[in-house]
């Protein structure tokens, strides 16, 4: 299911993230501009529900603060040099290994709040971007991730205790000494890892709220 970057009606503009609906029954609403947030939200929720969403989350307006808090997206920054070294190696994802990478990503991220779901079509975009990797040590798969410029766009370990090595290895694909990553505030395990590696929270990028589908 395709996302709708500009969902427009008489009440305003919002972005609808629908890619997870077929798999996790979740939809996300990002309010862009409105003078009538309640009515815009109602229309967005109706549309997401018609698409099959059973859980809906929204961000982008103070009106939403009346609803139950879901998670916040935090921006963390660290120094690549301070991450240390690892003997783990990076292997870029290819067309032959793309489906394996996608399956691992979706499996590891399915319980992470606000994590994207990558469809078969979405994986083609990942391949085109060329920033997806497997992380191995001596032939053993430690994890996967996405890394480009100054950002770690995804980190997932498949071996217990290998998270630090996966982060270290992925950082070698970056062109910047400053490493930036975004993490859900409810992903406590990841936050503990990044804190241990010297990352500091520098911003709260968004706050997401759970929207009831029957009480609007």
Ranges and model annotations:
Residues 163-164, 187-190, 207-212:
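Short glycine/proline-centered loop/turn elements that form peptide/ligand docking sites
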Residues 1-43, 136-159:
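Conserved donor-binding loop and adjoining core beta-sheet/short helix segment
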Residues 29-88, 181, 203-211:
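Acyl-donor-binding surface of acyltransferase catalytic domains
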Residues 55-58, 126-128, 145-147, 166-177:
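Alpha-helix C-terminal capping segments
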Residues 1-7, 111-138:
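Active-site rim helix/loop that mediates acceptor-substrate recognition in acyltransferases
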Residues 141, 201-204:
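Residue-level detector of beta-propeller blades
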Residues 1, 84-116:
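Short amphipathic alpha-helix that is part of the acyltransferase structural core
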Residues 35-47, 159-174, 191-196:
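Conserved acetyl-CoA-binding loop-helix of GNAT-fold acetyltransferases
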């Amino acid at each position: 299911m395709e996302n709708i970057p500009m969902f427009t009606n008489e009440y305003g503009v919002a972005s609808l993230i629908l890619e997870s609906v077929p798999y996790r029954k979740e939809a996300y609403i990002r309010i862009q501009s409105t003078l009538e947030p309640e009515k815009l939200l109602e229309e967005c929720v109706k549309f997401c529900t018609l698409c099959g969403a059973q859980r809906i989350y929204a961000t982008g307006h103070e009106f939403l603060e009346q609803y139950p808090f879901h998670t916040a997206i935090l921006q963390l920054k660290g120094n690549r040099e301070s991450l240390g070294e690892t003997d783990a190696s990076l292997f870029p994802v290819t067309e032959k290994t793309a489906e394996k990478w996608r399956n691992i990503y979706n499996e590891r991220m399915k319980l992470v709040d606000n994590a994207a779901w990558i469809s078969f079509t979405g994986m083609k975009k990942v391949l085109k971007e060329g920033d997806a990797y497997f992380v191995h040590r001596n032939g053993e798969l430690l994890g996967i991730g996405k890394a480009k410029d100054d950002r770690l766009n995804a980190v997932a370990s498949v071996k217990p205790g290998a998270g630090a090595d996966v982060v270290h290895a992925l950082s070698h694909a970056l062109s910047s000494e400053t490493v930036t990553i975004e993490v859900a505030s409810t992903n406590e395990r990841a936050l503990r890892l990044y804190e241990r590696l010297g990352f500091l929270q520098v911003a709260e990028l968004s706050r997401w709220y759970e929207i009831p589908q029957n009480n609007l």
